Amino acid sequence: MKVVEVKHPLVKHKIGLMREGDISTKRFRELATEVGSLLTYEATSDFETEKVTIEGWNGPVEVDQIKGKKVTVVPILRAGLGMMDGVLEHMPSARISVVGIYRDEETLEPIPYFNKLASNMEERIALVVDPMLATGGSMIATIDLLKEKGCQQIKVLVLVAAPEGIEALEKAHPDVELYCAAIDEKLNDKGYIVPGLGDAGDKIFGTK
């Protein structure tokens, strides 16, 4: 599995700001969007382009346009919504496919409860967004669903990943690509990433 930890100074700086214990909901939300945008830039760097002639201000002009499969952005509810706008800044016409999965607090197992996917998934590249890759359960369940619907090219964008989550994802889906802003030390006994960001969903939505 291709794993890319984006080491750009802006990414590292912004993730550092997100680790502050008393960060406001507004600031955390803004930074999640900004880092999501920067990860998208990296994840799409291998998209192919083709020459197209358009009508410019002074007559026909040849330009580069992205070719190939269409893109669908797949936020995992609810925290994934916090990164979605950052992705859409670069691809505003991308279709949105929503997947709802929550983690059982006792067993840590993923529980699917909702999905609404774009049409013709077999013709699309999926950019799956979720702030944290902890145990990997929710991400694996989401990718299972996407593949069941025919999607074969999948890129995962997360803010912070744990080694345990990376290992689980690679074992289940070695053909996907993972882009993250940080790979942290480990999971604690409650399944949270350490040092991590805390509960990203609560920080994005201002809930406890």
From Swiss-Prot:
Gene3D superfamilies registered for this protein in UniProt: 3.40.50.2020
Organism: Vibrio vulnificus (strain YJ016)
UniProt protein name: Uracil phosphoribosyltransferase
Co-factor note (free text): Binds 1 Mg(2+) ion per subunit. The magnesium is bound as Mg-PRPP.
Family indicated by similarity: Belongs to the UPRTase family.
Regulation of catalytic or functional activity: Allosterically activated by GTP.
Catalytic activity reported: UMP + diphosphate = 5-phospho-alpha-D-ribose 1-diphosphate + uracil
Keyword flag Lipid metabolism: no
UniProt xrefs under InterPro entries: PRibTrfase_dom, PRTase-like, Upp_B, UPRTase/APRTase, Ura_phspho_trans
Gene transcribed to yield this protein: upp
UniProt entry keywords in alphabetical sequence: Allosteric enzyme, Glycosyltransferase, GTP-binding, Magnesium, Nucleotide-binding, Transferase
One GO MF term attached to the UniProt entry: GTP binding
GO process terms (BP): UMP salvage; uracil salvage
Cofactor(s) named in the record: Mg(2+)
